[in-house]
């Protein structure tokens, strides 16, 4: 739904929605706007119930009448199953008072919530799961702060993707651009936040699953330092890299969430990680040259403009080489795959037809990783991690 301009955008929308539901045109309004321009507005009654509204601007180009702009208002669903697995008003009520009182949360379908099963983006896995007896600390912390759970939001299967599509439940819409992928694997929480259906997305990030959907949908996303936020009650993909993070529409909400969750109970404080309070840390940023140079020209230009604004504000922005990106990627891929197979391989092997093609291919590749390869990759990660830690120190690592 939304405004579509141009043949490409209209074709992309038609392709993404997976066909047109059976419907009957109840009425059409036609208004000529000139010899080669016409406006059509129609009301449809769907066979399965509900009505929709469609507005089309037609133009005669080279003797052919084409739709050059359109607006589609589909029938209103109870809730969008591509975004939500379970939704309530609220699903869980938070504390009546607290710094996050009045805000709602979309929880990625990997976190334990008492009384609910973890579905991991796969219906067969959901069917075989048992209801959780406790709630994950990352969820409970938000409830204690006054936020309420709006619902359980979709994820790419087992969080083993960053595209945002799901072959079982459909692809959540992109709240910033019609027809575009939402980004994953935290696709459901990101789209829920982008569409205003939740204020906070509680998500995970192993290889970009907070940052990618936030980027695709114009949101604020934070991948926290590995181990900073408790991961108990989280279905893992790869423990060496899994992190808990949040997605919001604005920086102030993200700051409020982080201030609470990074100072509560089991979360390590800024002082314990950096040896200094947040207010004492320098306004300093670190840009890896190889990552910056790998970006597309338009992205690189926007990123450089941000760096210039930061520098103009008095910040220190350092551009430093981190070495060949392939070294990082290969070591990461092997360790991630080995851990993913240990976590989910037994279930995947027992349900060979239950996983979508893209994720199934990743699991097949993961199953082929040998212990020797994993040991070698873990050994390779040690100096790479040490190098990044030494370069970052008390600076903020910034990537385009």
Go through each PLM region and give its residues.
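Short, well-ordered alpha-helical
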Residues: 71-131, 135, 158-160, 272
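Short glycine/serine-rich loop segments
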Residues: 143-258
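Short, solvent-exposed secondary-structure junction/capping segments
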Residues: 1-8, 205
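Short beta-strand edge/turn micro-motifs at domain boundaries
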Residues: 51-77
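Surface-exposed, charged secondary-structure patches
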Residues: 5-51, 55
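General beta-strand structural signal in soluble alpha/beta enzymes
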Residues: 107, 149-154, 202-204, 318-320, ...
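Conserved hydrophobic/aromatic pocket- or pore-lining residues that grip, position, or stack substrates
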Residues: 105-108, 142, 344
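Amidase signature
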Residues: 76-100, 263-400
